[in-house]
Amino acid sequence: MTRSAPAASATSRTAIGSAGAPAADARRALGARAEDAVVAHLAAQGVEIVARNARVGRLEIDVVARDGPVIAIIEVRTRGAGSYVRALDSIDARKRARVRRAGERLWRATFSRVRGVERMRFDAASVTFLPSGEATVEIIKAAF
């Protein structure tokens, strides 16, 4: 008698899905690709990349760059082509406040005493991936 494998129960599917590991891994990978695209875009413009995924306590800054005398704190967002919501629209007031808080702490701890650095600004970067895999990058300086 040949036995077939039992069908996955709704419970086991829910348990696997609720862990979110595959979805979370995919989001992290997409986020890393978006940050790669932003860093490449900035480097091509002669902007110095100071740090990626900079931790400030429990807060994180996606990209820290030096644009002449300015330290740019950059929040990176991504969406697929054809998304109904623009990537930049996903930076809500709460996220802006967290990024500002992280940037201000980083400024006090690191950049306030660096020669040649005059100020800090908060930029937003939107990365859209086309079906071909090509990325388009839009950076809004002093976005918030």
Curated annotation (Swiss-Prot):
Native organism taxonomy: Bacteria, Pseudomonadati, Myxococcota, Polyangia, Polyangiales
Pfam family, one: UPF0102
Alphabetized GO MF terms: nucleic acid binding
Homology family: Belongs to the UPF0102 family.
Gene3D superfamilies associated with the record: 3.40.1350.10
InterPro entries with a match to the protein in the record: Restrct_endonuc-II-like (IPR011335), tRNA_endonuc-like_dom_sf (IPR011856), UPF0102_YraN-like (IPR003509)
Annotated protein name in UniProt: UPF0102 protein sce2912
Superkingdom in the source lineage: Bacteria
